Amino acid sequence: MDTLLKTPNKLDFFIPQFHGFERLCSNNPYHSRVRLGVKKRAIKIVSSVVSGSAALLDLVPETKKENLDFELPLYDTSKSQVVDLAIVGGGPAGLAVAQQVSEAGLSVCSIDPSPKLIWPNNYGVWVDEFEAMDLLDCLDTTWSGAVVYVDEGVKKDLSRPYGRVNRKQLKSKMLQKCITNGVKFHQSKVTNVVHEEANSTVVCSDGVKIQASVVLDATGFSRCLVQYDKPYNPGYQVAYGIVAEVDGHPFDVDKMVFMDWRDKHLDSYPELKERNSKIPTFLYAMPFSSNRIFLEETSLVARPGLRMEDIQERMAARLKHLGINVKRIEEDERCVIPMGGPLPVLPQRVVGIGGTAGMVHPSTGYMVARTLAAAPIVANAIVRYLGSPSSNSLRGDQLSAEVWRDLWPIERRRQREFFCFGMDILLKLDLDATRRFFDAFFDLQPHYWHGFLSSRLFLPELLVFGLSLFSHASNTSRLEIMTKGTVPLAKMINNLVQDRD
């Protein structure tokens, strides 16, 4: 969806990618059963779907990294200049903060191993989110609305425009503003940060050391600089997607497919259907034309996450059922997104934003629009506490504490706690229960489901949202929410009571 990553964290369930992709994984229970001996029909079914998945992978081209044609002003390593802000990571979050802090006249150094590389991620956003940030020119395709297929014969039309982010345009726009504002760049990885009373020293893999008043970790899910002090056990959203040229597809080109939970494509694959009934996946699709489309099979959230191989097999079966013949794949992506889990230590010396700061929506996996909207909050706090002469005494730990406080105020922490409660319920739902949940969810007034997906509802409205969802749910779904949500609800209430400013 909008937070897709090609370079995930090191996860025990993650299978090596294309070129060395392990098609029959020895620790996959499904394939173990095949080797131990099952009926010949089952072996043929397995062989059929695996060969379909393999055929799909055979169309994936060699990865070509594309760089933007910019002359980046480099950080002068010979001068040992102390910068106001050192940003580790050149993704959307890092560049957004760099752009806004430098606009206020502060010195900024952006550190990234590939600062001109076009982001590999496919980002999808609601158009109103980018419109609010004056970024409509960074959408290359928009759809008048979206559709959700809950089940065969149950379809929800969502009259909320959706867009695909033009990665090249967004990064070009941000880089140009950074260059104009005087941001300096250093091409390297960061291995460590050493803190002193007033400043910090960023240690790079090439031996360069950069001193800064504030260090911002915008590296995504690496969690290498920002510290955590609680067990990290998130749910995982896992997906496999392709931008493909096809003979045709059955979807309306004026609407994107937000979720397709139908499973008729698995009728011929009982093993896959059984697994999908327990931990379901859905199709997310952005049709650009009648013969070009982005297709992605997604596990919304699971713990542990589904294996990439499993998702690719389900996708191959779905495309075959839909009659979608893939002629050529322009690019593919394998996505692993940690969701939920604890927030980092608040406060701490290194400031974070985006995935490293726990900003992924725990119930949906959304992050891009939320992070870009948070960039001005972080930037304004840094400028306010660092750039004003009256704040000269505010340095080091005190300065970072104020920035963290602005990024994660109590109302945002309470909001996130509610979203984690939602994730904990989703983790317990099988396919039928998931369908019932989203059948009720998308029947809510648009204000509520819009606000939930875009992180615009805060605790008072979230309580109304929860009651409204419960009232729209079927009796079966209400019973499921009550029985499976009791422990997560108690956990949420306990965390809310303990969390005070």
UniProtKB/Swiss-Prot annotation:
- Further comment: Plants overexpressing LYC1 exhibit improved tolerance to salt stress.
Q: What is the effect of changing residue 451 to E?
A: In szl1; slight reduction in plant growth, increased content of lutein, and decreased content of xanthophyll pigments (violaxanthin, antheraxanthin and zeaxanthin)
The protein's name in its UniProt record: Lycopene beta cyclase, chloroplastic
Pfam families xrefs: Lycopene_cycl
Q: What biological-process terms (Gene Ontology) are attached?
A: carotenoid biosynthetic process
Subcellular compartments: Plastid, Chloroplast
Substrates-to-products reaction catalysed = a carotenoid psi-end group = a carotenoid beta-end derivative
Catalytic activity, EC: 5.5.1.19
UniProt enzyme class: isomerase
The answer on whether this UniProt entry bears the keyword Ligase reads: no
Instruction: Name the protein family.
Output: Belongs to the lycopene cyclase family.
Q: Which PANTHER family match?
A: OS02G0190600 PROTEIN, PTHR39757
Q: Name one GO cellular component term.
A: chloroplast
Its annotated function is as follows: Involved in carotenoid biosynthesis. Catalyzes the double cyclization reaction which converts lycopene to beta-carotene and neurosporene to beta-zeacarotene. Major lycopene beta-cyclase that does not seem to be involved in neoxanthin synthesis. Involved in salt tolerance improvement by increasing synthesis of carotenoids, which impairs reactive oxygen species (ROS) and protects the photosynthetic system under salt stress.
According to the UniProt entry, its GO molecular function terms are: lycopene beta cyclase activity; oxidoreductase activity, acting on paired donors, with incorporation or reduction of molecular oxygen
Enumerate the residues binding NAD(+).
Answer: 85-113
- Supply the source organism for this entry: Arabidopsis thaliana (Mouse-ear cress)
Q: In which pathway does it act?
A: Carotenoid biosynthesis; beta-carotene biosynthesis; Carotenoid biosynthesis; beta-zeacarotene biosynthesis
* Primary localisation category: plastid
Transit peptide residues according to the UniProt entry: 1-48
